[in-house]
Swiss-Prot record:
Residues 130-553 form the Topo IA-type catalytic domain. The keyword Isomerase applies. Its cofactor is Mg(2+). This is DNA topoisomerase 1. Its EC number is 5.6.2.1. One of its GO terms (cellular component) is chromosome. The active site is at 298 (o-(5'-phospho-dna)-tyrosine intermediate). GO terms for molecular function: DNA binding; DNA topoisomerase type I (single strand cut, ATP-independent) activity; zinc ion binding.
């Protein structure tokens, strides 16, 4: 008896769906894209202004395609069940092509969640493949190939090898570089504050002096600050006014991709890549108290829509578990402000409210539980009543100055019951107008304005979203590309551009301004949305981009000056005798042998005076530790740097491959004879054997 064949992307998804269906169905995974543009060539044929992608079955999918063809041939019906977004639609298209079926006749089934009811409903309501969505994805893929294949080699030729450029990544990189320029150009401004504490421990803010309003940056002159301080020393203060306001704090909307990534970063410390990997697992299926199922809806979405049934279930759950006060009279409805949002999709929510975080703790690992709990509570919160807070401002004055004491308390916690930043209440005493207050402490303090902060990964995602750059599926990969290409390093959650990031951005700004222009990139994203909606032609879009872009590429070959000039040091390489020179790398300048790649000798370039030229021995000594290499007993242990930070290696590299994260000492372990390394801890500096783990205090 013939079976129905369902083809999905991932094995995990296939396994979960297979558990829901009977013996009449077989579910198999394509394991992602089975066709793509070739890696070894441009892969786009241009004939009579038509752009024809030359797709190939990827080498790691050859055997799988044979299996799919065989199973499809014998199947009663073949269902394409890839994700419901452009990428999923394109994967379905390529599957149909690869197995030799007409993409217009195969039934396409879609669902927002992987639950039994959702799959059964999808099978009852198949549709045709949406070729407009496929063409939007093809346009994006071809645009990325054009930019990457034509522009990246030019950057490699003019700046350094291994560089890349892309529509979204280059625009994102410019945002990071521009922020770094702001920070470097920032000039701090000194300002002063008059800080008052009234009895008992009541912090007060100066808001008025001689009838003039005082704000944060009002007092920038020290003499004036002293004058105001003197006026504040009058110890007779009385309450002149009391303001009290109630405020409703509306619950936040449910998560979409960008806000999930931001909240997971801020609350859980997860980077976007980690968030999406965990969310994918939760979507595709995990063990639950009711068997294997997807426990959240599709995680790549820019929609805030919620299924009517899901909202009704949430309202029942809220009333049953929290009471009627926590349930608004009508369901809360949210609409997205994101450019190009696909409203047919759903927001990210739990698929089964009975799978509570308490029950989930028995089935999910630590990080899965954290993210699931965040999604679960946010969904419940979005359908709960607002929180109500009361703010109180008490104004205290003498003859010349007015201070403000602020207080706050939560009158009703509302959605804060499950989700929210519950700041500690600052409840003020019962004051009366005319009441006198005594000064507990009064002082003048100096401050300096601070430069704008660098973007965090979550902050960059928020910025990209606000500018309409990229879509839910591209945020995490964009950051991964920037870090893997060494354009950006992440230090204490801050994105820091490298020297080469400045060089590349400068070249692109001068010669390919469209590529780094956020408005152009956003408009192109909007055009892709229009293609998906059949409001724009994909071939025309490619044509309008390609020809002006290629003219700039040709101009750039002669117009862009090479930055690969080297400064010879007049020194001989200690390894091969060749000439040493200063080269530019991803992390700045360094010394290298001109016989590269035959000779791999290199070292750090220490900051030197422009009028000072040091000889080779002096420079080598600057990196040296004076400790003999414990491995070869010939070389010297030297301090080196990589993109992961400082490490210690042998000066005889590459002949000696000794490497250590910690600085080796001259002492040996009494137990095994291994070299002890120096570890600096909060408790002090110790010597430790990495083999025996024996520690001993380091003597001065």
């Amino acid at each position: 008896m013939k079976k129905n064949l369902i083809i999905v992307e991932s094995p995990a998804k296939a396994k979960t769906i297979g558990n829901f269906l009977g013996k009449d169905y077989e579910v198999i995974a394509s394991k992602g894209h089975i066709r793509d543009l070739p890696k070894s060539s441009f892969g786009i044929k241009i004939e009579d202004d038509e752009f024809i992608p030359e797709y190939r079955i990827t080498s790691d999918h050859s055997a799988l395609v044979k299996e799919l063809k065989s199973k499809a041939k014998d199947a009663k019906e073949v269902y394409l069940a890839t994700d419901e977004d452009r990428e999923g639609e394109a994967i379905a298209y390529h599957i149909a092509k690869a197995i030799g079926k007409d993409e217009n006749t195969l039934p396409r089934i879609v669902f927002h969640e992987i639950t039994k009811s959702a799959i059964e409903n999808a099978l009852k309501n198949p549709r045709k493949l949406n070729m407009h969505s496929v063409n939007a994805q093809q346009t994006r893929r071809l645009l990325d190939r054009i930019v990457g294949y034509k522009l990246s080699p030019l950057l490699g030729q003019k700046i350094q090898r291994g560089l890349s450029a892309g529509r979204v990544q280059s625009a994102a990189l410019k945002i990071i570089v521009d922020r770094e320029k702001e920070i470097r150009a920032f000039v701090p401004l000194e300002y002063f504050s008059i800080d008052m504490i009234f009895q008992k421990d009541l912090d007060a803010e100066l808001v008025e002096f001689d009838k003039a309003k005082i704000e944060k940056l009002t007092i920038t002159n020290k003499d004036r600050a002293k004058l105001i301080l003197e006026a504040c020393k009058n110890e007779v203060y009385s309450i002149s006014d009391i303001e009290s306001k109630e405020r409703k704090i509306a619950p936040p909307p449910p998560f979409m991709t960008s806000t999930l990534q931001q909240s997971a970063s801020n609350r859980l410390g997860f980077n976007p890549k980690k968030t999406m990997m965990i969310a994918q697992k939760l979507y595709e299926g995990v063990n639950t108290h009711e068997g294997v199922m997807g426990v959240i809806t599709y995680m790549r979405t820019d929609s805030l829509n919620l299924a009517k049934e899901a909202v009704e279930n949430a309202r029942k759950f809220i009333q049953a578990n929290f009471g009627k006060d926590y349930l608004p009279s009508k369901a809360n409805v949210y609409t997205t402000k994101t450019k190009g949002a696909q409203e047919a999709h759903e927001a990210i929510r739990p698929t089964n409210l009975s799978f509570t975080p308490e029950i989930a703790a028995k089935f999910l690992d630590k990080d899965e539980l954290k993210l699931y709990t965040l999604i679960y509570n946010r969904f419940l919160a979005c359908q709960m009543s607002p929180a109500i807070s009361q703010t109180q401002n008490v104004f205290v004055k003498n003859d010349r100055v007015v201070f403000k004491i602020s207080g706050r308390k939560i009158l009703f916690d509302g959605y804060y019951k499950v989700y929210g930043d519950m700041d500690k209440d600052k409840i003020l005493p019962n004051f009366k107008i005319g009441q006198n207050l005594k000064v507990q402490n009064l002082e003048m303090n100096s401050h300096f304005t601070e430069p704008p902060s660098r973007y965090s990964e979550a902050g960059l995602v928020k910025k990209l979203e606000s500018l309409g750059i990229g879509r839910p599926s591209t945020y995490a990969p964009t950051i991964s590309i920037l870090t893997s290409r060494d354009y950006v390093t992440i230090d204490k959650k801050q994105l820091i551009p490298s020297d080469v990031a400045f060089n590349v951005t400068e070249v692109l700004e001068k010669n390919f301004s469209d590529i780094v222009d956020s408005k152009f990139t956003s408009n192109l994203e909007n055009t892709l949305d229009e293609i998906a909606e059949d409001k724009a032609d994909w071939q025309e879009t490619l044509k309008e981009f390609y020809y002006p872009f290629m003219r700039k590429i040709e101009e750039g070959k002669t117009k862009i000056a090479s930055q690969k000039t080297v400064t010879k040091l007049g020194e001989s390489c200690p390894d091969c005798g060749g000439e040493l020179a200063i080269r530019k790398g991803r992390f700045g300048e360094f010394v290298a042998c001109l016989n590269f790649p035959k000779c791999k000798y290199s070292r750090n370039l220490k900051s030197e005076s422009k009028n000072e030229s040091e000889n080779t021995a002096a420079k080598a000594k600057a990196n040296g530790t004076g400790i003999t290499c414990p491995s070869c007993q010939k070389g010297e242990i030297v301090e080196r740097f990589s993109k992961r930070g400082k490490f210690y290696g042998c000066s005889a590299y590459p002949k000696c491959n000794f490497i250590s994260k910690y600085k080796p000492s001259e002492e040996k372990c009494e137990e095994c004879g291994e070299t002890l390394v120096i570890k600096e801890l909060k408790k002090g500096t110790f010597l430790e054997c990495l083999k025996c783990k024996i520690k001993k205090e380091m003597k001065d």
